[in-house]
Each structure stands twice: as C-alpha cells, then as structure tokens.
Amino acid sequence: MTSLGSQLHRATFLTALLLLLLLQVKGVKTLIVSASLDGDKSQKDKVSSEDQGEEEYEEHFEASSEGEQWQEIDMVQQEDTISQAITLQDHLLDLAFCFNLASIMFFL
C-alpha cells in the first residue's frame, strides 16, 4: 500500500473513531440529564400543592426573619458558577482526550 493510501486509511479511521467518541460522550451526558429530570419530576409529584405553598411561605419567613435572604441569593449564584466551571472542565477533558487519541493514531 502506498503512503498516500495508508494516510487516507489512517485519516478515515481516525475520523470515524472521533465521531464515535463524540457521539458516545454526548449520549452519556444526555442520559444523565434525562435521568436527573425524571427524578425531579417524581419528587415533585410526591409533594401536594398545599404542602408546596406552606413550604414556600415557611422558607421565605425563615429567610426574612433570620436575615438570610441575601445569603440565599449568593448561594444560587455560587451554584451557577460551579456548574458552569464543571461543564467547561468536562468539555476540555473531552477535547483533550480526542486530541490525545488523534496524536496516537497520527504517530502509528
């Protein structure tokens, strides 16, 4: 086989492998997200509408009576920042893994 033919086969194999890895990673993340959404729905079904109203009122009352309302807002912002950082880290790790695999295939 010529070097050009070998390079074409290597490039085709690498492309197919990268596509499979990307699809697998996206599929796993989709399954995790859908499973967590299903769990949230079942938990919401368990709590009746009257209980929800009482819980919201109690949480608001406790937060305002103890002066923790600003702390709750900060906690929500902190959770958003943490989740964004985790998402970015996941994407970077996936990208690094794909580049490492590509470099291994290139030097084979």
Swiss-Prot record:
Keyword vocabulary terms for this entry: Fertilization, Secreted, Signal
Region of interest (Disordered), residue spans: 39-64
Family matches, as Pfam families: LLCFC1 (PF15838)
A GO cellular-component term linked to this record: extracellular region
UniProt note: phenotype after gene disruption: Male infertility. Sperm are morphologically normal, exhibit normal motility and can penetrate the zona pellucida but are unable to fuse with the egg membrane. No effect on amount or localization of sperm-egg fusion protein IZUMO1.
Keyword NADP: no
GO BP annotation list: fusion of sperm to egg plasma membrane involved in single fertilization
Signal peptide (residue range): 1-30
Tissue: Detected in testicular germ cells and spermatozoa (at protein level). Abundantly expressed in testis.
Highest taxon above the source species: Eukaryota
Bias (Basic and acidic residues) ranges: 39-49
Compartment(s) of residence: Secreted
Role summary: Sperm protein required for fusion of sperm with the egg membrane during fertilization.
Entry protein name: Sperm-egg fusion protein LLCFC1
The organism of origin for this protein: Mus musculus (Mouse)
Lineage of the species this protein comes from: Eukaryota, Metazoa, Chordata, Craniata, Vertebrata
